[in-house]
């Protein structure tokens, strides 16, 4: 039996409840710490004297703090397991990244992270446990993977401005290391019935809003796949989930309302440095969703902020980078950079404009402007 979703169309939206509660959610794309970003953190630690064990990821992500820190609930997607502070670390295809990134994620304002992905089990159950222990130490909430079968049954519910908000996380199957049958509980694999069950348990525990992070789709495609579209249809007709946040494609895909519920198919990469950057893999989006209590559930509006990972050029042997070239990997709040360019070169500004234009186009590609109401975020960035 279909369940009516709490998010209704603009034409039939109920009135905002006088004195009703409200809160904002910021969500971003994959956190994927490639070796070049570890090298950058080592370089930055030498300059700042901050961080742990010679790694400081703070400068890398500082550019998004003015947005992320302003949300009432900020959700990241921690795609990979972490190793020990001094390593060893690994990149693609079996990631093992510095736990120091978790402290930085907390520092820029993230509250909780989804952890179910095709890389969750890259280094087995021991690495899953190490990752969740490190997230606990950093003060980050987590959902999608578990240290024990008992923990796998727990629901991540947070009080956000007096509203009980549950966060769920599910993924397609593991990448190179299939999860042993006896450890299937270690991370949530996509199954519509399992998602329904998790939502039901969240509601039983008092959740008033349920947000689902889902790791799905085809990598490097800016359009959702048929299985994504089919699952989005089922989620928005057979459950009461209030917001769907997608990851995995490593490029931006549309945000649209499906049967009255916002679905962000892919927010691209929050931070990554692929071995062969395409330009699209460096462009991402922060989804910004405002929930307002109405006389009949929740009205949800959607905004977005474009991000870009600045990457230093790779000079040919014996050559020096051109004057004014990017010197460090940095995650850029594109709108903020365009509004206050300072002494940025025309080449840099042109790159930022391209990121803004392309991201807007991909996000709008399934009709989100107009009737759906998706707009660029206007927010005072301190």
Question: Where in this protein do the model-derived segments appear?
Answer:
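Acidic, metal/ion-coordinating pockets
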Residues: 7-382
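Sec-dependent bacterial lipoprotein signal peptides
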Residues: 1-5
């Amino acid at each position: 039996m279909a369940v009516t979703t709490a998010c209704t169309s603009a034409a039939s939206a109920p009135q905002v409840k006088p004195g009703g509660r409200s809160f904002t959610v910021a969500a971003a794309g994959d956190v994927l710490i490639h070796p070049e970003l570890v090298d950058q953190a080592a370089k930055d630690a030498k300059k700042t004297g901050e961080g742990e064990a010679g790694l400081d990821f703070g400068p890398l992500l500082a550019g998004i703090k003015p947005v992320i820190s302003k949300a009432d609930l900020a959700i990241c997607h921690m795609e990979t397991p972490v190793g020990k502070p001094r390593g060893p670390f690994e990149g693609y295809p079996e990631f093992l990244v510095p736990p120091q990134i978790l402290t930085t994620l907390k520092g820029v304002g993230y509250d909780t992270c989804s952890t179910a992905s095709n890389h969750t089990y890259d280094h087995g159950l021991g690495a899953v446990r190490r990752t969740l222990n490190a997230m606990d130490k950093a003060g980050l909430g987590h959902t999608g993977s578990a240290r024990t079968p008992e923990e796998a049954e727990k629901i991540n519910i947070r009080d956000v401005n007096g509203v009980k908000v549950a966060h769920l996380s599910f993924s397609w199957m593991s990448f190179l290391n299939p999860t042993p049958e006896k450890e299937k509980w270690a991370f949530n694999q996509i199954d519509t019935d399992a998602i329904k069950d998790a939502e039901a348990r969240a509601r039983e525990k008092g959740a008033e809003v349920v947000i689902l992070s889902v790791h799905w789709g085809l990598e490097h495609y800016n359009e959702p796949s048929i299985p994504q579209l089919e699952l989005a249809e089922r989620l928005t007709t057979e459950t009461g989930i209030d917001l769907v946040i997608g990851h995995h494609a490593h490029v931006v895909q549309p945000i649209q309302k499906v049967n009255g519920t916002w679905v962000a198919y892919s927010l691209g990469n929050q931070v990554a440095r692929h071995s062969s950057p395409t330009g699209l893999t460096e462009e991402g989006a922060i989804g910004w969703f405002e929930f307002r209590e109405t006389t009949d559930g929740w009205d949800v509006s959607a905004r977005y902020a474009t991000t870009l990972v600045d990457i230093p050029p790779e000079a040919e042997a014996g050559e020096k980078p051109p004057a004014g070239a990017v010197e460090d990997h940095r995650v850029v709040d594109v709108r903020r950079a365009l509004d206050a360019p300072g002494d940025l070169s025309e080449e840099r500004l042109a790159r930022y404009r391209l990121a803004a234009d392309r991201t807007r186009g991909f996000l709008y590609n399934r009709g989100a402007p107009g009737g759906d109401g998706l707009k660029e975020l206007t927010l005072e960035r301190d």
